[in-house]
Amino acid sequence: MIPIIVLIGRTNVGKSTLFNVLTKTRDALVANYPGITRDRQYGYCKLQSNKKIILIDTAGLDIKLNEIEKQAQAQTLIAIKEAHLILFLVNARDGLMPQEYEISKNIRKYQKKTILVINKIDGINEASKINEFYSLGFEKIQKISASHNQGINTLINRYLIPWISEKFKKKITENLYKDTELKKIAIKVAFIGRPNVGKSTLINGILKEERMITSNTPGTTLDSISTPIKYNYENYTLIDTAGASKKKKKINDFQRFSIIKTLQTIEKSNVILLIIDASLQTCHQDLSLADFIIHSGKGIVVVVNKCDLFNSVELKKIKELIKSKLKFLYFSKIHFISALYKKGIFQLFKSIKESYEDSKRKISTSTLIRTMHIAIKKHQPPIIKGRRIKLKYAHLGSSNPPKIIIHGNQVKYLSLPYKRYLINFFYKTLKIKGTPIQIQFKDNENPYVKNKN
């Protein structure tokens, strides 16, 4: 299970700044689904030793005292329920505010481990302003300045990493099996998408039975359901994001799309089917989900459903538009299907298997070095301070997803366009399909530089 940490506090205490520092900003996924507060953001945070957490940034709680409980239930208390750890942020410059007593009361109701984070300590000389926060009664307290990156490492090393190590002792790795055993393992396929795009209908079509409840109401499915299946002698586990049992008649509290369950499903899967509604085409949520899947390093296959609603002329325009918007997923197959009429659904398995096998592929060092040299010959790295950046050799750092390590001189000066060029070249030359690849650049240190007097 991946740890979940939520940031809560009033407006302007620096939650979003800390969120961006920890997630490196670009990992954020904005939740814009029915029933979910738009101000809540979800992101991955990678700590030292490759410890990964899900971080939630919530809306500010700047409201009247008699409305706190009502408003918090609408946006922040749901996040608190989902979280394993709470980072309660306060603003040192403002001092202790009445709302923070109310927020702390709400936190204690759920008996979640909490760290009080006193932010914006830069330029503060009044010790009394900071000391008054101790009256909130939290044992774990850390002073930081998120905007100046001050105290962040202490927060991580003193509190977050020890907490993760203690609470999540069991480490789940996908590399426990030898290559010869991979065929015996079921490929875990997650069906991800916005509410009502046809995830359950697609699984029902594959299973040829009504295993999932389907309806036109967004948010019908509440808990993830895993279903084993064998197709063409290969074992698969189909995971529907958040499903509902027939016993559940009320969906009052959860007419919402569970981002947390989606992210957890992505984490435990091998290949992700990103399902898009052709009638709605692509929107910000689809693009955000796609970006999140790429950052998670999982294989991805794009499935555009409900194509039966359009004639051939309309469908051609939709295909062109969707391919244009998803051009950053050039390494992934895009399938246009009708889950309702079972058109094109079994062609998905070929792409799923390709994606899975390519994510596990072992690429030799000689192949990577040769590919790198061909790329350099066609397009040389830029010249920095009169010297051309040199890329010397490459090797595979890890698989699932494939991670290529390139060593050279001055590689820290490589531009983003040139890095993209190399990634695209490796994709094309190595014919990698359906899985993101990562490239890490390492500067070769000159052993004589450190010995200079």
Swiss-Prot record:
A Gene Ontology molecular function term of the record: ribosome binding
GO biological process: ribosome biogenesis
Binding site for GTP 1: 9-16, 57-61, 119-122
Domain KH-like: start-end pairs: 361-445
The EngA-type G domain, residue ranges: 3-167, 187-360
Pfam families named among the record's database cross-references: KH_dom-like, MMR_HSR1
Source domain of life: Bacteria
Keyword NAD set for record: no
UniProt entry keywords in alphabetical sequence: GTP-binding, Nucleotide-binding, Repeat, Ribosome biogenesis
UniProt-annotated binding residues for GTP 2: 193-200, 240-244, 305-308
Subunit structure: Associates with the 50S ribosomal subunit.
NCBIfam families in the record: GTPase_EngA (TIGR03594), small_GTP (TIGR00231)
Functional note: GTPase that plays an essential role in the late steps of ribosome biogenesis.
Family classification: Belongs to the TRAFAC class TrmE-Era-EngA-EngB-Septin-like GTPase superfamily. EngA (Der) GTPase family.
Name under which the protein is recorded: GTPase Der
Source organism: Buchnera aphidicola subsp. Acyrthosiphon pisum (strain Tuc7)
Species classification: Bacteria, Pseudomonadati, Pseudomonadota, Gammaproteobacteria, Enterobacterales
